[in-house]
A protein has these predicted regions:
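A long-range scaffold signal marking pre-active-site subdomains of enzyme folds
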Residues: 1-190
């Protein structure tokens, strides 16, 4: 008895909630300030990724380092592991753990996101290369079930972190009318 853990949401109770914005710590905890800080969406435009790739390849061709001033802001604001520009835009830290956050193409394979090194946001699909896997728009957000009491189910928290990428393509067929979602569920209770 008392072992059942649950987090659920109905469509839609205006006052009851089992989920809150933001990542969890490696042991599945968070605080109100973290939830408040992460109550946002991170949007990256595909046209900015294409321009970034062009500028990076031009810098490499000239034998120079890419000037950070030439990196689009949406790439600098992207919540990926090790982003060196994060603190220029936000007053809170990125989590530093093995799960990372937003998926990205890692040009130099160092496992840290740095657009100056040719890195850019991408869609993470297991078994598929990330190098050319970017859409016309990516929206990333993260939420959890441990940020407060479960007022919808009255259940105990699972300590689940959910990282989401919504993405879309501008095309001349039915794909233009679709939005795709990639969910990464991380059980922080183990």
């Amino acid at each position: 008895a008392g072992n059942l853990k649950i987090a659920a949401q109905t469509y839609r109770s205006a006052t009851a909630n089992d989920f809150w914005p933001g990542p969890l710590s490696s042991i599945g905890t968070t605080g109100a300030d973290t939830c408040e800080n992460w109550d946002r969406f991170f949007i990256v435009k595909g046209v900015d990724i294409k321009e970034h790739i062009r500028a990076y390849e031009e810098a490499v061709g000239l034998g120079i380092e890419l000037d950070p001033e030439n990196i689009p802001d949406d790439l600098k604001k992207y919540p990926a592991r090790g982003n060196p520009y994060w603190s220029e835009y936000y007053d809170f830290d990125l989590p530093n753990d093995n799960q990372g956050l937003g998926a990205f193409f890692d040009a130099n394979g160092d496992n840290n996101y740095d657009p100056k090194d040719g890195d850019y946001p991408a869609i993470e699909v297991k078994g598929c290369p990330t190098e050319s896997n970017f859409p016309d728009e990516i929206v990333f957000w993260v939420y959890n079930d441990a940020g407060n009491s479960h007022t919808n189910t009255n259940g105990r928290p699972i300590r689940m972190e959910v990282q989401v990428q919504a993405f879309a393509y501008a095309t001349n067929d039915q794909i233009n009318d679709m939005t795709f979602y990639r969910y990464k569920l991380i059980n922080r209770a183990v």
